[in-house]
């Protein structure tokens, strides 16, 4: 049974400005493993990655019903499966997590659905 659905939209240019203003911005949003991937990327792809992870973590917090605040960005980790699709590898939720991250020229959108395991 679906117990939560969250979506989030991030402006890529706003994320880039935040990253340029603070050298610690990426390390606040990303886990160590995510940060390793982030630093291996270049140019626009780097900012898209950061914006996508931020949007996905915000979407998770909405689906989970907590919002970012009681849940920290570091409590969530999103890596790629063997096909390259994003998956949560760290979260406080024990059920199934479905995630989609989409990019356009100016925005990144993320959608997260939380589903209870069959009882």
From Swiss-Prot:
* Chief place of localization: cytoplasm
Q: Binding positions for Mg(2+)? A: 8, 58
Cofactor(s) recorded in Swiss-Prot or TrEMBL = Mg(2+)
Q: Name one GO molecular function term.
A: magnesium ion binding
* Enzyme class, UniProt record, top EC level: transferase
Q: Where in the cell is it found?
A: Cytoplasm
Q: Name one Pfam family in it.
A: ACPS
- What InterPro entries does the record point to? 4-PPantetheinyl_Trfase_dom (IPR008278), 4-PPantetheinyl_Trfase_dom_sf (IPR037143), ACPS (IPR002582), Ppantetheine-prot_Trfase_dom (IPR004568)
Matching Gene3D superfamilies, A to Z?
4'-phosphopantetheinyl transferase domain (3.90.470.20)
Q: Name one GO biological process term.
A: fatty acid biosynthetic process
EC number(s) for this protein?
2.7.8.7
What keyword terms does UniProt attach to this protein?
Cytoplasm, Fatty acid biosynthesis, Fatty acid metabolism, Lipid biosynthesis, Lipid metabolism, Magnesium, Metal-binding, Transferase
| Segment forming the signal sequence | none
This enzyme catalyses: apo-[ACP] + CoA = holo-[ACP] + adenosine 3',5'-bisphosphate + H(+)
GO cellular component annotations of the record: cytoplasm
Q: What does this protein do?
A: Transfers the 4'-phosphopantetheine moiety from coenzyme A to a Ser of acyl-carrier-protein.
Q: Please state which protein family the record places this protein in.
A: Belongs to the P-Pant transferase superfamily. AcpS family.
**Protein's recorded name:** Holo-[acyl-carrier-protein] synthase
Gene behind this protein = acpS
């Amino acid at each position: 049974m679906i117990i939560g659905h969250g979506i989030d939209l991030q402006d890529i240019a706003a994320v880039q400005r935040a990253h340029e203003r603070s050298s610690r911005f990426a390390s606040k949003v990303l886990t160590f493993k995510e940060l390793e991937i982030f630093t291996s990327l270049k140019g626009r792809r780097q900012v898209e990655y950061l914006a996508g992870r931020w949007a996905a973590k915000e979407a998770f917090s909405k689906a989970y019903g907590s919002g970012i605040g009681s849940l920290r960005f570091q409590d969530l980790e999103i890596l790629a499966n063997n096909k390259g699709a994003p998956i949560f590898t760290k979260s406080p939720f024990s059920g199934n997590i479905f995630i989609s991250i989409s990019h356009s020229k100016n925005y990144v959108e993320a959608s997260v659905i939380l589903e209870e395991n069959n009882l």
